[in-house]
Amino acid sequence: MSAGPGGPQGGMQPPREQSKRLQQTQAQVDEVVDIMRVNVEKVLDRDQKISQLDDRAEALQAGASQFEASAGKLKRKYWWKNCKMMLILGAIIGVIVIIIIVWVVTSQDSGGDDSGSKTPATAGTSPKPVESGVQGGGGRQQRPHSQLVERRNVLRRTEDHIGCRPHIHSFIHIFMICLV
């Protein structure tokens, strides 16, 4: 039996080999399709996660903007409170300084008139009158030490008159020295 043009020795392959190749190709195509399905599912999941992440980022940005605005308001609020406290503190200190100055000035004015309340250290001495910066004929000004002594004597008379406590005495003494 001789093989014809459609026989196995001709240009064509037997149907078993063709079907085997077709099955292999179909298996490869099925495998590629399965891989593509998995990849598409992963891309869809990734897109969903990116969308959620974008929503979270927008919410976080809105929260950050709100926080920044409220922090700015709070900063301004406490800055004004601090300014008010500084003004109040300055006013209180100013009032205290004015009271002390008025008290010292009035106590110096009234201290010379009270002759019965002199301390033993100043009882035998008479207060020296303070002239207008000129003493005697030399044209020299009165020494700061004698002014300090006179102020100290006035301070002592005032303390005796009002009965100051020692710590107030120290404060007033330091204040009087600073005035010189």
From Swiss-Prot:
CDD domains: R-SNARE_VAMP2
Site residues by UniProt ((Microbial infection) Cleavage): Q48, K49, I50, Q66, F67
Places the protein is found: Cytoplasmic vesicle, Secretory vesicle, Synaptic vesicle membrane; Synapse, Synaptosome
Biased composition (Gly residues): 1-10
GO CC terms of this entry: neuron projection; synaptic vesicle membrane
Transmembrane segment boundaries: 85-104
Positions in the Cytoplasmic compartment: 1-84
Pfam family, one: Synaptobrevin
Domain called v-SNARE coiled-coil homology: residue spans: 21-81
Description of post-translational modifications: (Microbial infection) Targeted and hydrolyzed by C.botulinum neurotoxin type D (BoNT/D, botD) which hydrolyzes the 49-Lys-|-Ile-50 bond and probably inhibits neurotransmitter release.
InterPro entries: Synaptobrevin-like, Synaptobrevin/VAMP, V_SNARE_CC
Bilayer topology term: Single-pass type IV membrane protein
Family membership noted in the UniProt record: Belongs to the synaptobrevin family.
Its job: Intrinsic membrane protein of small synaptic vesicles.
Protein name, UniProt field: Synaptobrevin
